[in-house]
């Protein structure tokens, strides 16, 4: 059964939306409108000119959790944008999230961005930028935008049959099983995975990879379900600031943000097949992550894609949307969900 506390809190969030505490621009900008504004945004960023996209006065911009003026940060050094653009559109609330390949000063990067659109103008901008030097750990190594090619995986682009489309709350609940399962994972809270589930992080597959010759299997060699069932990711000690920001009901997509905290107290752990996983990083750290979940017609997580970078331990994402998942009343230490 899905977490009732998450359900209750998300219903509270829905009520806040109804009162206008969230994006007020839903309904007057459909999918084509939102995607067009996203493309304009990327073109304006490469041109280093905010005037080339409709940005409302007072719009707040953050890059990797830090508030910056426009144009600054990536807006000053972006040199090109590639064809790869994975878009998640939420016309009901006037939000769009997208992943894109780009370059800064000629070096390849990955960009995750959420835009709030009100009256056909951008009113919020939240970006996570993974540079080629942002390690994601293990054999995946550095961010590899080249692996993504020119188009997203087809599952992200297909509309679900009308009878298979789900409500916002159910989609949030399904996506949340992933983060609930990964926190201190011991294989006891399995997410709702489809058999064909695959995950890409910073351009590298982190599931279903072939085992290198002469090497022992690790978490990235298993399917999504197998890796969770075995108890990998046990050192992900706290998943906080879970925000389900863009819900694309037509395509079954959830665009979300989270902080993966590692408190560095776990130096090794043993998974269910007897393999011992050693943790090489010695200091606490956090992954700042924007993640897209594709939920299939059976209501299971089929595809996962993430853009992430390492940030100081406990760093805030820089935003408070009003919905906190998990519910603060369900926390043991101010952050962690009680199972």
Go through the PLM ranges and name each one.
Residues 1-9:
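Bacterial N-terminal signal peptides that target proteins for export
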């Amino acid at each position: 059964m899905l977490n009732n506390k998450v359900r209750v809190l998300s219903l509270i969030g829905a009520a806040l939306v109804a009162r206008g505490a969230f994006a007020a621009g839903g309904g007057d900008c459909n999918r084509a409108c939102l995607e067009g504004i996203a493309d304009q945004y990327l073109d304006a960023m490469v041109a280093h000119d905010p005037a080339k996209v409709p940005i409302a006065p007072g719009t707040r911009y953050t890059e990797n959790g830090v508030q910056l003026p426009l144009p600054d940060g990536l807006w000053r050094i972006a040199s090109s944008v590639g064809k790869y653009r994975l878009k998640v559109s939420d016309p009901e609330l006037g939000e769009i999230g997208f992943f894109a390949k780009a370059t800064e000063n000629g070096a390849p990067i990955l960009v995750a961005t959420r835009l709030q659109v009100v009256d056909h103008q951008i009113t919020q901008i939240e970006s996570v930028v993974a540079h080629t030097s942002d390690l994601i750990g293990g054999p995946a190594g550095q961010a590899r935008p080249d692996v993504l090619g020119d188009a997203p995986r087809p599952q992200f682009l297909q509309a679900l049959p009308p009878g298979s489309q789900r409500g916002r709350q159910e989609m949030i609940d399904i996506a949340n099983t992933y983060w609930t399962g990964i926190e201190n994972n011991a294989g006891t809270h399995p997410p709702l995975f489809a058999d064909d589930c695959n995950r890409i992080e910073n351009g590298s597959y982190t599931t279903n990879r072939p085992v290198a010759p002469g090497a022992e299997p690790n978490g990235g060699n298993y399917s999504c379900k197998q890796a969770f069932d075995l108890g990998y990711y046990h050192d992900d000690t706290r998943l906080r600031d879970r925000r389900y920001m863009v819900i694309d009901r037509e395509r079954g997509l959830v665009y979300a943000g989270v902080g993966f905290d590692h408190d560095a107290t776990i130096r090794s752990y043993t998974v269910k097949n007897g393999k011992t996983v050693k943790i090489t990083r010695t200091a606490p750290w956090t992954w700042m992550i924007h993640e897209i979940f594709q939920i299939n017609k059976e209501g299971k997580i089929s595809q996962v894609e993430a853009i992430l970078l390492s940030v100081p331990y406990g760093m805030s994402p820089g935003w408070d949307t009003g919905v906190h998942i998990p519910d603060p009343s369900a926390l043991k230490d101010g952050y962690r969900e009680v199972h």
